[in-house]
Protein backbone atom coordinates (compact mmCIF):
# COMPACT_ATOMS: atom_id res chain seq x y z
CA UNK A 1 0.00 0.00 0.00
CA UNK A 2 1.35 3.42 -0.99
CA UNK A 3 2.08 6.06 1.61
CA UNK A 4 -0.61 8.75 1.81
CA UNK A 5 -0.83 12.32 3.08
CA UNK A 6 -3.85 14.25 4.33
CA UNK A 7 -4.30 17.69 2.79
CA UNK A 8 -6.72 20.20 4.36
CA UNK A 9 -7.70 23.55 2.85
CA UNK A 10 -7.27 26.28 5.49
CA UNK A 11 -7.82 29.47 3.47
CA UNK A 12 -10.26 30.62 0.79
CA UNK A 13 -9.41 30.46 -2.90
CA UNK A 14 -11.29 33.71 -3.62
CA UNK A 15 -9.01 36.29 -5.20
CA UNK A 16 -6.16 33.83 -5.79
CA UNK A 17 -4.33 33.22 -9.03
CA UNK A 18 -6.33 31.05 -11.46
CA UNK A 19 -3.43 28.57 -11.55
CA UNK A 20 -3.61 28.17 -7.76
CA UNK A 21 -7.40 27.68 -7.86
CA UNK A 22 -6.92 24.97 -10.50
CA UNK A 23 -4.29 23.30 -8.33
CA UNK A 24 -6.71 23.14 -5.38
CA UNK A 25 -9.34 21.54 -7.62
CA UNK A 26 -6.71 19.13 -8.92
CA UNK A 27 -6.04 18.06 -5.35
CA UNK A 28 -9.79 17.61 -4.86
CA UNK A 29 -10.23 20.48 -2.39
CA UNK A 30 -13.48 22.43 -2.69
CA UNK A 31 -13.92 24.51 0.47
CA UNK A 32 -12.25 25.64 3.69
CA UNK A 33 -11.93 22.75 6.13
CA UNK A 34 -12.22 20.10 3.39
CA UNK A 35 -9.73 17.24 3.84
CA UNK A 36 -8.62 14.71 1.24
CA UNK A 37 -6.16 11.81 1.30
CA UNK A 38 -3.71 11.62 -1.59
CA UNK A 39 -0.80 9.33 -2.45
CA UNK A 40 2.56 10.79 -1.47
CA UNK A 41 4.04 11.20 -4.95
CA UNK A 42 6.36 13.90 -6.33
CA UNK A 43 3.49 15.27 -8.45
CA UNK A 44 1.18 15.66 -5.46
CA UNK A 45 4.00 17.15 -3.36
CA UNK A 46 4.61 19.73 -6.09
CA UNK A 47 0.93 20.70 -6.11
CA UNK A 48 0.93 21.01 -2.32
CA UNK A 49 4.08 23.17 -2.40
CA UNK A 50 2.46 25.53 -4.92
CA UNK A 51 -0.52 26.23 -2.64
CA UNK A 52 1.23 25.66 0.69
CA UNK A 53 -0.05 29.01 2.01
CA UNK A 54 -3.66 27.73 1.69
CA UNK A 55 -3.34 24.14 2.90
CA UNK A 56 -2.20 22.09 5.88
CA UNK A 57 -0.47 18.73 5.35
CA UNK A 58 -0.43 15.75 7.72
CA UNK A 59 1.87 12.80 7.09
From Swiss-Prot:
Q: How does it assemble?
A: Part of the 50S ribosomal subunit.
Superkingdom of origin: Bacteria
Q: Is Ribosomal protein there in the keyword field?
A: yes
A GO MF term? structural constituent of ribosome
Query: Which biological process terms from the Gene Ontology are attached to this UniProt entry?
Result: translation
Identify one Gene Ontology CC term for this UniProt entry.
cytosolic large ribosomal subunit
Protein name, UniProt field? Large ribosomal subunit protein uL30
Tell me which UniProt keywords the record has, alphabetically. Answer: Ribonucleoprotein, Ribosomal protein
Q: Which family does it belong to?
A: Belongs to the universal ribosomal protein uL30 family.
The gene that this protein is the product of is: rpmD
Amino acid sequence: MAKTIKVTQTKSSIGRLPKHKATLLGLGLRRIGHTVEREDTPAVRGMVNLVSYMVKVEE
